[in-house]
Amino acid sequence: MKNNEDKMESVLKTKKLNDQERKKALIVDDETDICYLLSNILKQKNIQTVFAGSLAEADKVLQSSGYFYYVFLDNHLPDGLGINQIKRWKQKFPSTHVIMITAHDSYEERRKASNDGADDFIAKPFSKEIIWKSIVPTSA
């Protein structure tokens, strides 16, 4: 386990990521249909996905699986608001791209997400083109 921690720390310090590390996404959403839809869209760009249905599950996945290049984060989850995790996750994993995806789109939520470090904010429903635009600068 120490080797994984050392590797993750090295990756975060250098921010020089290999192709494999750029191709991992964590999808945090309690709606299974959304998880599968996002996963299918991301697979078209060769991005591997892992699902978490709650914030607690996402924390466990982040602790055990290490680095994810993308985190697609729903806001309204069974155990809290995803938007409240952005700052903490960005502090711990500064080069992870956090992309909020929520049906509850408001100016206040967009502003808070942006101020806390979200890299993008996407309203549901979304199209694959919108998802691709959110990852193109980093997946090319």
Segments from the language model and where they lie:
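Short amphipathic alpha-helix used as the core "switch/output" element in two-component signaling
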Residues: 83-95
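Acidic catalytic/metal-coordinating carboxylates
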Residues: 53-54, 81-84
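Non-catalytic signal-transmission and effector/linker regions of two-component phosphorelay proteins
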Residues: 1-24, 129-140
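Two-component/phosphorelay signaling modules centered on CheY-like receiver
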Residues: 32-50
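Alpha4 helix (beta4-alpha4-beta5 surface) of REC/receiver domains from two-component response regulators
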Residues: 84, 105-120, 133
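Acidic, metal-coordinating helix/loop segments flanking the phosphotransfer/catalytic sites
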Residues: 51-70
